[in-house]
Regions:
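PLP-dependent enzyme catalytic core of the Aspartate aminotransferase-like
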Residues: 22, 54, 98, 221-268
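Conserved glycine-rich beta-strand-loop-beta hairpin in the small C-terminal domain of fold type I
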Residues: 161, 173-188, 198-213, 238-241
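Short hydrophobic/aromatic beta-strand micro-patches
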Residues: 123, 211-213, 245-247
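Alpha-helix termini
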Residues: 20-29, 55-66, 91-98, 127-133, ...
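Conserved core segment of the aminotransferase class I/II
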Residues: 94-178
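Hydrophobic residues at beta-strand termini and immediately following loops
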Residues: 2-5, 105, 235
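Active-site phosphate-binding strand-loop segment of PLP-dependent enzymes
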Residues: 6-84
């Protein structure tokens, strides 16, 4: 399992990504997970970054390396800036190169605002695969599902199918999306206008969350302080990363919550 440095100069670290891909390619194959909007940072690549990510994958595949490109799209579509790539990287990687097998993992939990449904789907894409090869992949996948989760919950799937057919669904989704975007903009403005010596916001432009790089303090200690003294719940990803779900905070309370986070960090 290989990680790479995600950010550089406020954007996606293409150099670190390419180095990690090329290092792993020495074995003859690469498995890469493309998780956008990225959790926990809440970052999605710009149009230019998405183009370059795909070019890196294509260049490596052209050298004879087999690539499994997995697009984790659980938060896809919740973009709040105009320069974000609007299309899933799955669509780009499907016919990018014969040596690339694209996989899309997606679900309605966040995109369709159905928290707790815990259902999703997985599909494949490659321009050179035959119907027989697709059938073989699907059969393998069905076997994995039967031997692990057995079967997905039927009620959520039935409800979602009915919702998809209802013309009111998209109207409601747009209303909720606008609420999230409004909350995002408040947080974006706060982070642009307020500074804390021990909290550095990681780049964010989409999704449900944003995170801070905790400088010189322990994020778990900060999490406990916020919960015990301020009644604010956040998640410490590791000792240096604190995730905040701005999506669940009413807009009138956002500035108060973030002021408390900054204050608690300084007090540690």
């Amino acid at each position: 399992f290989r990680q790479f440095s995600l950010f550089k100069n406020g954007g996606f670290n293409l150099e670190s990504f390419e180095q990690a891909i090329r290092d792993e390619a020495k074995s003859g194959s690469v498995r890469v997970i493309l998780n956008f909007p990225q959790n926990p940072s809440g970052y999605s690549p710009t149009k230019d970054e998405a183009e370059k990510i795909c070019q890196i994958l294509k260049d490596v595949a052209s050298s004879g390396v087999k690539i499994l490109a997995i697009s984790d799209d659980a938060y896809f579509g919740l973009n709040y800036e105009d320069n974000i790539e609007p299309e899933s990287l799955f669509a780009r990687t499907c016919d990018l190169h014969p040596n690339i097998l694209a996989v899309k993992i997606d679900g309605p939990t966040k995109e369709d605002f159905v928290w707790g449904f815990r259902s999703g789907f997985l599909t494949f894409g490659n321009s050179t695969l035959t119907s027989e090869q697709y059938t073989a992949l699907i059969t393998k996948l069905m076997g994995i599902i039967r031997s692990s989760v057995s079967c997905s919950s039927t009620p959520p799937q039935s409800l979602l199918l009915r919702a998809i057919k209802d013309p009111a669904t998209n109207i409601q989704k747009n209303e909720y999306r606008n609420i999230l975007e409004e909350r995002y903009k408040i947080v974006r403005n706060f982070c642009n206008t307020h500074k804390c010596s021990c909290l550095e916001p990681l780049p964010f432009n989409s999704g449900y969350f944003m995170s801070f790089n905790v400088i010189g303090k322990d994020s778990e200690q900060l999490r406990k302080k916020l919960l015990n003294e301020y009644g604010i719940g956040v998640v410490s990803i590791d000792s240096k990363t604190l995730r905040v779900a701005f999506s669940s905070i009413e807009k009138e309370k956002l500035e108060t919550v973030y002021e408390a986070i900054f204050k608690a960090a300084e007090e540690l």
